[in-house]
Amino acid sequence: MQVTTEAVSGVARRLNVSVPTSRINEQFEARLKRTAKTAKINGFRPGKVPLSRVRSDFGPGIYQEVVNDIIRDTVFEAIQQEKINAVGMPNIEKVEHKDDALVYEATVEVYPEVEVKAFDTLEVERKAAEINDKDVDAMIENLQKQRQTWAVTKGMAKKDMQVTFDFEGEVDGEKFEGGSAEDFKLVLGSGRMIPGFEDGIIGMKAGEEKVIDVTFPEDYQAANLAGKAAKFKITVKQVEKPKLPEIDAEFLKIFGISEEDGVEKLKADVRKNMEREVRNGLRNQVKQAAFDALVAANEIDVPSAMVAQEIDRQREQMIQQFTQQFGGAGAQSFDKSMLPDELFKEQAEKSVKLGVLVSKVLADAKLEVDQARVDTYIDEMASSYEDPTEVVDYFKNDKQQRAQIEAVVLEDQVVDHILAAAKVTETEVSYDDLLKEQQARQAR
């Protein structure tokens, strides 16, 4: 077998393969004889059919089977012979019989060979944040709001109050589907309704009626309403103001704090949790910034097969999240066509490029996972649980779980390696801004 290779692109190779006809004929004759032993043809006993009859009746089909099998076998022999780091399945083209050989072309994608640019050309922004007393007080107030109750008031509806009301909507003088409801509850300022709707209710009291004018957004989900002006008749039935629970013994007990330890212990625990959130948020921020800079500075081609695999992985991940959120019944009604490749392609390409570059950085720097950092990571993660020792034992003894953490820590080591040489600028941010940025990254 003769093989020549040419580069089609940075991630594709074309192999020209020539297989001697003698190899085909040898396998063809052997398979023809095996077929003769079992062939069933009228007028002949099993196993007694002349080889010439088997050749005339079955020969063309058997010959094509042999050719297909030889191409399948030899293409992988050729890839191995040429020491090609193939990705995905080869594509067979131009199969021909020339002189005493079977000749064909095969195109195969290959793992990219890249050279990473020097890190001192990278510019990375590293955020910094501190927890202050106001942040802690605001977090405790949020904990109170999560357990707030409602008290009826005769006063005017204001932002953050809950209003119970009926509404009837019209567009061009006609009622429309979903445009009316009774005993509808809405916290003013929540942003649940279209722009202007909640503002129109502010200032109303129980028992009052009012017609408000609003306009549906141009990108409204119901196309027949998008951009349309509408009138809504509002009848307020009840207005309630929020009532926060007192920080008393009962409230403290929810968080495992005794009355003796009091609010100071609550503040200390809340601060500790917030500081852990900040550390994680800052680590994720600088990791994302470093990796974004790495990808932006190194323009590389990646095989479509790797991108396709990443698209499938991201799609399956989204379906799993959908299943967890809506249950098995909801997942069964979920159609994968609702998640086309285009939805994931851009992010998948970026993810594959990053994976290739990180692998190259690991190889060039000869980085190996720091087991001490893995243990520290596990200890810190376990500290947020009721029984940290049990969690530590679980992650340290479960090989699969530990391997996942090792992968995260190894990424952190790559980031540290990049930052040691990159141009890093420090930026102070507030706790709230840091969380908003983190939520925005997760939503992408």
UniProtKB/Swiss-Prot annotation:
Its EC number is 5.2.1.8. Keywords: Cell cycle, Cell division, Chaperone, Cytoplasm, Isomerase, Rotamase. GO terms for biological process: 'de novo' cotranslational protein folding; cell division; chaperone-mediated protein folding; protein transport; protein unfolding. One of its GO terms (molecular function) is protein folding chaperone. The keyword Cytoplasm applies. GO terms for cellular component: cytoplasm. It comes from the Bacteria. It catalyses: [protein]-peptidylproline (omega=180) = [protein]-peptidylproline (omega=0). PROSITE patterns: FKBP_PPIASE (PS50059). Pfam families: FKBP_C, Trigger_C, Trigger_N. It is an enzyme of class 5 (isomerase). Residues 160-245 form the PPIase FKBP-type domain. Belongs to the FKBP-type PPIase family. Tig subfamily. Consists of 3 domains; the N-terminus binds the ribosome, the middle domain has PPIase activity, while the C-terminus has intrinsic chaperone activity on its own. PANTHER family: TRIGGER FACTOR CHAPERONE AND PEPTIDYL-PROLYL CIS/TRANS ISOMERASE, TRIGGER FACTOR-LIKE PROTEIN TIG, CHLOROPLASTIC. Involved in protein export. Acts as a chaperone by maintaining the newly synthesized protein in an open conformation. Functions as a peptidyl-prolyl cis-trans isomerase. This is Trigger factor. It comes from Acinetobacter baylyi (strain ATCC 33305 / BD413 / ADP1).
